[in-house]
Amino acid sequence: MDAIKKKMQAMKLEKDNAMDRALLCEQQARDANLRAEKAEEEARSLQKKTQQIENDLDQTMEQLMQVNAKLDEKDKALQNAESEVAALNRRIQLLEEDLERSEERLATATAKLAEASQADDESERARKILESKGLADEERMDALENQLKEARFMAEEADKKYDEVARKLAMVEADLERAEERAESGESKIVELEEELRVVGNNLKSLEVSEEKANLREEEYKQQIKTLTTRLKEAEARAEFAERSVQKLQKEVDRLEDELVHEKEKYKFICDDLDMTFTELVGY
């Protein structure tokens, strides 16, 4: 009988232990379910966050492609401006060559004037001799008239050449104005690109990268932004250089115009002197 009681007590104790283990297992199962639900929720949150990061990265890549396209357009515009500046330099060189040739013709006309003056002196001496002898030297007068006609013809040709130079200078001024307008347009595009780069930088800073692949892509984008910033600074420097070149060309055009006015005044003086000399010779 005692053995049965002991056995019953042992079975009861084993039952109580089994109940305790069952309760513990149930609690562990509930805890495991809670952890599983929490893990699933974290996984969904992480997946949603990763999808958002992918979308932001795709949007950033599209913005970077647009910035690259706009920078390429800016490079083409700057190259066109540089080509126009080179063309203006060539035109200035041609104008300088024309001016040199005009100066050579002016020197020739001046030499002719000196010869005419010398011939006039000789004619004066001959006139006095002829007055004393009562003879007229018609051949000398014809030669002087021919020289005066030739000098006048050269002066007229020089005037025509200077008119052509003035017309070319007007064309150069128009080209300079167009180059300045393109330089101003380039500066406004640079400001727009700076604003877009700032927006891209802010978007990149707001991204939370949780995976190694996302970290690597973020570093690549930062490097691209650094490269784009460097190219933007280079574009700004090239735009400033183009503006300085335009200003330099404008100063050169002003100098050529001043020389043109000066040379016309010299030609006018020579023509007046030739007319006066011819009048004096005819009066004799």
UniProtKB/Swiss-Prot annotation:
Highest taxon of source: Eukaryota
Organism: Periplaneta americana
A Pfam family the protein falls into: Tropomyosin
Protein name: Tropomyosin Per a 7.0103
SUPFAM superfamilies reported in the protein's UniProt record: Tropomyosin (SSF57997)
Family in the record: Belongs to the tropomyosin family.
Quaternary structure and interacting proteins, as annotated: Homodimer.
Annotated keywords: Allergen, Coiled coil, Muscle protein, Repeat
GO biological process, alphabetically ordered: regulation of muscle contraction
Keyword Membrane: no
Residue ranges that the Swiss-Prot or TrEMBL entry lists as coiled coil: 1-266
Molecular function GO labels: protein homodimerization activity
